[in-house]
Amino acid sequence: MKKHLILLTGIVISCLAVIAQNKGTTLTEKERAGLDHMLSTDPMFAQLIPQFGDPVTLYENFKIDLVRSDSIWEADQERLGVMQNLGVTETFEMVPLIDGISQDSDLAAEPGVSYLIRTDEATILFDVGLNVPDSDPSPLLRNMERLGIQMEDIDIMVISHNHGDHVGGQKWVPQHTFSVTNHQIDLGEKTIYVPEPMTYPGQEPIYSYDPVKIAEGVATIGVIHCPMFVSHVQEQAIAVNVKGKGVVVISGCGHQTIDKLVERSEKIFKEPIYGLIGGFHLPVTESRHIMRYYGWMVTGKLPWATLTKEDVEQYVAMLQDHHIEVVGISGHDSCDWSIEAFKKAYREHYIDLYVGERITLGTLASKLL
């Protein structure tokens, strides 16, 4: 029965994609005027955007991708059922090994993500940072050493999506692989979960499009398609069911969008969604390393009509409406204004994400000794 449903889903999506193309992907006069205005008034956009392709073609493909991704999302949400065997963990500890902000001069920050997650059953490495200097040891490995963490301590690795700031550097992206330093080391007998077909020497990474349990009380929430003007990416997040609390959703970049992360989690888990922690890509203003071009990578948004403060405020209100009790926003892809908006709303229930600072659900943040 499940195979028939999957086949039917594929047929429906294909038909919708054809309908979308038949409606016309050629830019309207208004759309072309918006693109031309951006190219003529924003030198950074005019210089950088051709590196991704012809601007008109990018826009036309983006229009197709929006319809296709929405159709896939609706079909997946209809198809997916509740995970019956998620289980629970009494232990939840998360340590940002790489993130955008560090308050310790001995621990490197960079515009990337790598989180260590400990539960009763497993130690999980979620993403592997950016490695800006392309060095060995990488900032990730140096931070791990200073925190007393070894690669041998890690049982499971999960990659959220194939962007350079999550797979260990841009050079690995076209190869559909990843690395914890500037060359690929022996990872031993780790189980690795990826959001698209990826490889690693000596390993067989597991690609599961649908949600999958990876340890007792821990699962991925499945792949969600994320259409952006300059590219398309598939991203997955991790969910941890903590005893006495509920499900904590941990996101890498949040290209899925906050609303879809919540909707998917509420769809597949019978337990309440307790918290949302990680990267959510909310670059409204320029701050630290968050530059204007970060706004070009917002899912479903045009570079000249990108995320606004009102959008962020709506996300805050949505999480409160859904009774999400704790929130923590990564500084690697969100600006200070967005972080402060969530801090103001959540107050003592807001979790600061600083490199090396341990997060537990008993005490929201304490220094890892």
State where each predicted segment sits.
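Conserved beta-strand hairpin/beta-sheet module of binuclear metal-dependent hydrolase folds
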Residues: 96-147, 231, 235-250
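Divalent metal-coordination and catalytic microenvironments
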Residues: 117, 127, 144, 161, ...
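Metallo-beta-lactamase
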Residues: 181-238, 351-362
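Charged, glycine/proline-rich intrinsically disordered loops and linkers
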Residues: 39-76, 170-181, 287-310
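Active-site metal-binding motif and surrounding structural segment of the metallo-beta-lactamase
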Residues: 136-190, 267-281
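Cap/insert and terminal regions of metallo-dependent hydrolase folds
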Residues: 156, 244-248, 256-360
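Zn-dependent metallo-beta-lactamase
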Residues: 21-120, 211-227
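Sec-dependent N-terminal signal peptides
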Residues: 4-14
